[in-house]
UniProtKB/Swiss-Prot annotation:
PROSITE patterns: TPR, TPR_REGION. TPR repeats lie at residues 35-68, 72-105, 120-153. This is Photosystem I assembly protein Ycf3. Signal peptide: none annotated. It comes from Rippkaea orientalis (strain PCC 8801 / RF-1) (Cyanothece sp. (strain PCC 8801)). GO terms for biological process: photosynthesis. Belongs to the Ycf3 family. Its main location: membrane. It is a peripheral membrane protein.
């Protein structure tokens, strides 16, 4: 039974009914509709913390989805799961694939920056100052891109950029 048929709460059931109606009237081919069902089930599993099930659904969606923008969101969600599981390198791989398909995705750019910043912190703790600075610079570049796309978001990143002297702008928003 598909995950979306197992939802217990009213909001999930309502969303599922609405999504099913939209799928029926959406002028999309069958393959795209199937991809959406897998994506929707992946999001539901991910929200429930069922990461293995979510990944299975996302991988199936990737096999079917052809639209680059839609693929970027699938890849982004796969990246989130890998980051949640502590696999930063794999998360970076998927976030970068997502940005390659959709360079206007500030959340993916932010997540890439967060990982580089974290890696910079670890390098600094281990006394690898040059490596830390290089990682911080990478984080700064990704945060600047994210902030340009969503100037009212990422306030902590904006402050960090200012405090560390990595900001060329006085005000982002």
């Amino acid at each position: 039974m598909p995950r979306t048929q197992r939802n217990d709460n009213f909001i999930d059931k309502t969303f599922t009914v609405m999504a099913d109606i939209i799928l029926k009237i959406l002028p999309a081919n069958q393959k795209a509709k199937e991809a959406f069902v897998y994506y929707r089930d992946g999001m539901s599993a991910q929200a429930d913390g069922e990461y293995a099930e979510a990944l299975d659904n996302y991988y199936e969606a990737l096999k079917l989805e052809e639209d680059p923008n839609d693929r970027s969101y699938i890849l982004y969600n796969i990246g989130i799961i890998h980051a949640s599981n502590g696999d930063q390198e794999k998360a970076l791989e998927y976030y970068n694939q997502s940005v390659d398909l959709n360079p206007r995705m500030p959340s993916a750019l932010n997540n890439i920056a967060v990982i580089y910043h974290y890696q910079g912190e670890k390098a600094r703790e281990e006394g690898r100052e040059e490596e830390a600075e290089a990682l911080y610079d990478k984080a700064a570049e990704y945060w600047k891109q994210a902030i340009r796309l969503a100037p009212n978001n990422y306030i902590e990143a904006q402050n960090w950029l200012k405090v560390t002297g990595r900001s060329e702008m006085d005000v982002f928003f």
